[in-house]
Amino acid sequence: MAAKEVVFGNDARVKMLAGVNILANAVKVTLGPKGRNVVLDKSFGSPLITKDGVSVAKEIELEDKFENMGAQMVKEVASKANDAAGDGTTTATVLAQAIVTEGLKAVAAGMNPMDLKRGIDKAVAAAVIELKNLSQDCADSKAIAQVGTISANSDESIGQIIATAMEKVGKEGVITVEEGQALENELDVVEGMQFDRGYLSPYFINKPETGSVELDHPFVLLVDKKISNIRELLPILEGLAKTGKPLLIVAEDVEGEALATLVVNNMRGIVKVAAVKAPGFGDRRKAMLQDVAILTGGTVIAEEIGLELEKATLEDLGTAKRVVITKDNTTIIDGNGEQAQIEARVSQIKQQIEESTSDYDKEKLQERMAKLAGGVAVIKVGAATEVEMKEKKARVEDALHATRAAVEEGVVPGGGVALVRVASKIADVEVANEDQKHGVVIALRAMEAPLRQIATNAGEEASVVANTVKNGSGNYGYNAGNDTYGDMLEMGILDPTKVTRSALQFAASIAGLMITTEAMVAELPKADAPDMGGMGGMGGMGGMM
């Protein structure tokens, strides 16, 4: 085991604070509408320009081991805030720096670190309750657009496109962000349930101009096995011929004689039919077939539950308003399943998402839920260059996380005002002694830090702005975008409650622990080995005969 270096007391805290400050100072220049960008060097490709706090924090690694420990702990604050709410990483970093700075001053003045931490924890617990009281629902499209705009660094086009996407696919729908090909942002919405399986034979195509199959008001047959014998399908096909309606078959596979007969019947116009493979594999396929069954009001024909294809009737089939099948995708629009059953299935999938530990499984479950609940929207980010594209895509992703958080827990006045108002309400929180009281004061001072930093980044005097806002009441705050004071909600400056709450909780949690540090241990830097001496030259070779 390598030798370790140990530093104690004030020496340890000074080193740790230096690391905290280096990281936080790099991150906090990005805060607010007039925050600046940070350029990150990449080992390959062009540098990345970003205004996202967590992206900056993740890049920072310091040479001094003890300073680096301080920086890494604040990096953890930003990462945790990002994981919980997807935004608010810069706010969390600013709060953590403020708590650590004030806390270490108090420790140096001889106060008890453990009591300081208890005081900070009590203040934060009270602040979280007050934030909930201050919070308002974010229900309408206008409020969603405002939250998106603020999170995307006051870019209204991003806020608007996210609000439109949410309106189209619902709050449970999936919205993904991709790099587009054009200069402008684009929104693609797939309504209904789409899965990535196309037609099994091009002879099913009935719209040659688009190369697709379109079925109006079709029956949907769902089978969890391969179909190779046409005899199994005859009862269903005979029943269908009488109704004159088209049929979509979704099965593990349709092959051989069965596929050939379906194609012939389709081309002769006896039965209008199309067949596709079931989506997914193994257990996921079974689950997705069941999703389609619930969406269309049908039954999955599976031998393991005692249902045979030969004995299936029209009662077992689902129905939909329309089905569109291309070479690669099948889309079922307006399935006729019962709304109550669909909602029950969605809440069952929600439960599975909460219990799942795998990110991949969560993503797949989220997709399934979206397809049942509303649809899938894709925002294609447009930009002139790759560097701008990456920067813009990161902002769109942040804005998307912020709007989701806003829909979940509501919104509070933005621009750092919510924390200032909360601080004024919890000043008299109950504590056991003077040191705990000072811990509360540290937390209250830290809650002003985001507002002060927004003002500083806008080129204003932080103390003047903070006092003006503190003397106001309710939603009154400072709009750094146009250098005016007024009602933040009316000006459309909103922060998601979840983002503000998460930032405060994670910052206080880690900063509180840092204040209580008394010793730090790190590996000694290895001394460089001496260079190898140069090799002696080779003697000249004699003349050759």
From Swiss-Prot:
UniProt cross-references to PANTHER family, sorted A to Z: 60 KDA HEAT SHOCK PROTEIN, MITOCHONDRIAL (PTHR45633)
The family this protein is said to belong to: Belongs to the chaperonin (HSP60) family.
HAMAP family assigned to the protein according to its UniProt record, in alphabetical order: CH60
Class of the enzyme per the UniProt entry, highest EC level: isomerase
Keywords: ATP-binding, Chaperone, Cytoplasm, Isomerase, Nucleotide-binding
Single GO term (MF): unfolded protein binding
GO cellular component, one term: cytoplasm
Coiled-coil stretches noted in the UniProt entry, renumbered to this chain: none
Protein name: Chaperonin GroEL
Physiological role: Together with its co-chaperonin GroES, plays an essential role in assisting protein folding. The GroEL-GroES system forms a nano-cage that allows encapsulation of the non-native substrate proteins and provides a physical environment optimized to promote and accelerate protein folding.
Cellular compartment(s): Cytoplasm
Primary subcellular site in the record, as a coarse category: cytoplasm
Residues reported in the UniProt entry to bind ATP: 30-33, 51, 87-91, 415, 495
One GO-annotated biological process of the protein: protein refolding
InterPro entries referenced in this protein's UniProt entry, alphabetically: Chaperonin_Cpn60_CS (IPR018370), Cpn60/GroEL (IPR001844), Cpn60/GroEL/TCP-1 (IPR002423), GroEL-like_apical_dom_sf (IPR027409), GROEL-like_equatorial_sf (IPR027413), TCP-1-like_intermed_sf (IPR027410)
